Regions:
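Membrane-proximal, proline-rich intrinsically disordered regions
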Residues: 1-50
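Extended ligand-binding clefts on enzyme/binding-domain cores
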Residues: 21-22, 26, 173, 214-215, ...
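Conserved, well-structured interaction surfaces
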Residues: 64-139, 169, 187-190
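Short coil/linker segments at helix-helix boundaries
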Residues: 108-115, 138-172, 176
Length: 253
């Protein structure tokens, strides 16, 4: 009775254009799903620093993440090129949403739909900023090394030809785009706390971190202070911290 004909909620046939707010939401769902890849926040992005910093141990070499533990930086190792491929795939999916919205392909028929579409656009901008930020942290020097003059990663804000080979931007140029995207996203996003989707406070929290990595202490402080004083989030107490790892959401999310 139609059970096998249910339309997927995270993908759409490539030959069909994005024309409705529902289509844009499906595309956004797919972008969020990509964030949970084991090559991104589903595993490796969360353990990368701990593996290299000595907080984690690898009892048996030869497993998938041992290269991180031993600092075996080789371009052909899955541990390293998978970050690059996955994060640029996230950027591609974000750009697909943003390009279709900018070109007027997504039609709204009510004020409510227009508000939802702005929300989707804001989330896509924030996700693109997050992916560029993470790429630059993984493959570029810290901003404070030389005020962002070193090579970072390619800034990609449009849908590229499959065979395109964009050149690397400087770290400063990457940060400029990240900040532009986040400042554009913030007014489009709601302030209400919601689980599973980014809101205005999440964008401001990320912006505060970007300013911190950049060494822009005043903006980092003021932006973080704005998030804290919103009252929507509180740090776990010492008593609740351990138990929080068993919960999907909490006072900090």
């Amino acid at each position: 009775d139609g059970f096998l004909n249910v339309k997927p909620s995270t993908s759409k046939e490539s030959g069909k254009s994005m024309s409705t707010v529902s289509d844009a939401q499906v595309a956004l769902n797919g972008t969020y799903r990509r964030l949970t890849s084991s090559n991104y926040y589903g595993r490796r992005m969360l353990t990368y620093g701990d593996m290299k910093g000595g907080d984690f141990g690898v009892p048996t070499l030869g497993i998938s993440d041992d290269a991180l533990y031993t600092f075996a930086h080789e371009k052909d190792r899955n541990n390293y090129y998978s970050f690059w491929a996955t994060l640029y795939d996230v950027i591609l999916q974000s750009n697909n949403i943003l390009t279709n919205i900018a070109n007027g392909n997504v039609i709204t028929s009510s004020t409510a739909e227009a508000t939802t579409l702005n929300d989707i656009k804001g989330q896509a901008l924030m996700i693109r900023a997050l992916a560029h930020f993470d790429l630059c942290r993984l493959y570029g020097y810290p901003y404070l090394k030389d005020n962002g003059a070193s090579w970072g990663v390619p800034v990609v804000t449009s849908i590229l030809d499959p065979f395109a080979k964009p050149v690397r931007n400087t770290v400063a140029e990457v940060y400029t785009q990240i900040i532009l995207d986040l400042n554009a996203a913030i007014p489009l996003l709601p302030t209400a706390k919601r689980l599973g989707n980014m809101n205005q406070w999440a964008a401001k929290a990320l912006l505060a971190r970007v300013y911190l990595y950049k060494g822009d202490w005043t903006n980092a402080y003021n932006t973080a202070k704005n998030v804290i004083e919103s009252g929507g989030y509180t740090l776990y107490s010492n008593t609740n911290w351990v138990g929080s790892w068993a919960q999907p959401n909490g006072s900090e999310s």
